[in-house]
Every structure is written in C-alpha cells, then in structure tokens.
Curated annotation (Swiss-Prot):
Its EC number is 2.1.1.170. S-adenosyl-L-methionine binds at G79, F84, A130, E131, R148. GO terms for cellular component: cytosol. PANTHER family: S-ADENOSYL-L-METHIONINE-DEPENDENT METHYLTRANSFERASES SUPERFAMILY PROTEIN. It is an enzyme of class 2 (transferase). GO terms for molecular function: rRNA (guanine-N7-)-methyltransferase activity. It comes from the Bacteria. Pfam families: GidB. Gene3D superfamilies: Vaccinia Virus protein VP39. It comes from Myxococcus xanthus (strain DK1622). This is Ribosomal RNA small subunit methyltransferase G.
Length: 217
C-alpha cells in the first residue's frame, strides 16, 4: 500500500466512521504500521499483517471510539496487545496521557519502542497483570479505562471499576452488539450505569462493532 492509497483509505474510513482527525495523522500511522510489521516479522504481535487490514482492523477500529475518549486527560488501555486502541488514540489526541498494560512482555516492548520511534510523550507501556488491585500491581487509575476484545463483558465490568478515577468512565469495545436491555442488566450487576452505546461497522469489511460507555452509580 503506497502513501497516497493509505491516506485515501484513512480519509474514507474516518468519513465513514464520522470521526475527524488532524492532517498529519496519516504519516504517523504509517510509521506505526512500519514499526508493527517490522517487529511482527520477528515476534508474534498480531495475526493481522496485510496493510489494508492493519489500517481497518487496528487503526480505524481504534479511531472509531474517538467520540468516547475525546476530552479525557488520561486513558488506561488494559490488555493492550500490540497497542490498540491506545497508540492510535494517542496519535489522534496528542495531549492525552496513555498507559498501555499487557501481560506479554514482547508486546509491551513493542509499545515502548513504537512510542520512542514516534517521539510520543505521555505514553507508558506497562508489563503487568490486572487483577483488580491497582496499587499492588503498579497500574495507575485513569479518567477513561478502555479495552478491546480483552475479556467477556461481565468479567470486564467486574474488573474495570477498580482502575477508574472518581467520576471517570469505562469504555468497552465489543464485537457482537448487545441490546440496551442486555447492557443495562450487565451494568446493574456491578452498580454501574450505561452512559451511552452505539453500534457501527468497519468501513471496508462491514464487520459489526459496538462501543459502550459505563460509569459508577
């Protein structure tokens, strides 16, 4: 995928998702892709390696939740894997402080290397396991907690509140959309409330997604 096609596909994807990004995001995402594919040739970071799929399934899927994250000062990405959604969100929102946590050391090493290569400030990669004890785990709380396909929603809502600052929110990036009633029932089980929920499709494959936001009652 050449630079012009990447830029065209990024612009088309963002339009389809209804998100607005800065003009310099394209080149920075291309650098991130280059780092990802270079590392992935040596260590297994992701099964998604075709540039078109990296753009859609990693980058655009991450950027789709910009409306749910914009305005926050800090973001905690649990189960970040190779840095998604945290790294694309950081590139789109430079002032956002981002901590990305994963249990796999090589993925955290990549996150740190990619952040250094891109000259990102306010990004921290953390090799840790989140089990609901942030103080002992060394995981900082954040205004927004996010995860993409990290665990089933009931387990996520059981774990997440421990990592959210007072007044903060929990964002769940889901594959199969759930009904409003299902989301409300899951939230109530953990003394949470549903702030918002919306379904969307990835712009090229049409894959279904949903993003739901929760807050403490």
């Amino acid at each position: 995928m050449d630079n012009a096609r990447f830029e065209d596909q990024l612009a088309a994807g963002c339009r389809a998702l209804g998100v607005t990004v800065a003009a310099d995001l394209g080149p920075r995402l291309q650098r991130l892709m280059s780092e990802l594919l270079k590392w992935n040739a040596k260590v297994n970071l992701t099964a998604i390696t075709a540039p078109e799929e990296v753009l859609e399934k990693h980058f655009l899927d991450s950027l789709a939740v910009l409306p749910e994250v914009t305005g926050a000062a800090t973001l905690l990405d649990l189960g970040a894997g190779a840095g998604f959604p945290g790294l694309p969100l950081k590139l789109a929102l430079p002032a956002l402080g981002v901590t990305l946590v994963d249990t796999v050391g090589k993925k955290v090493a990549f996150i740190k290397a990619a952040a250094a290569s891109l000259g990102l400030q306010g990004v921290r990669g953390l090799h840790a396991r989140a089990e609901g004890q942030p103080e002992t785990e060394g995981i900082p709380r954040a205004e927004v907690l996010i995860a993409r396909a990290f665990m089933d929603l009931p387990d996520w809502l059981a774990l997440a509140p421990a990592y959210v600052e007072p007044g903060g929110r929990v964002v769940a990036m889901l594959g199969k959309p759930q009904t409003d009633a299902e989301l409300a029932a899951r939230a109530a089980e953990r003394q949470l409330r549903v702030v918002s929920a919306r379904a969307y499709r990835l712009p090229f494959s049409g894959a279904e997604r949903q993003v739901a936001v929760f807050a403490k009652e």
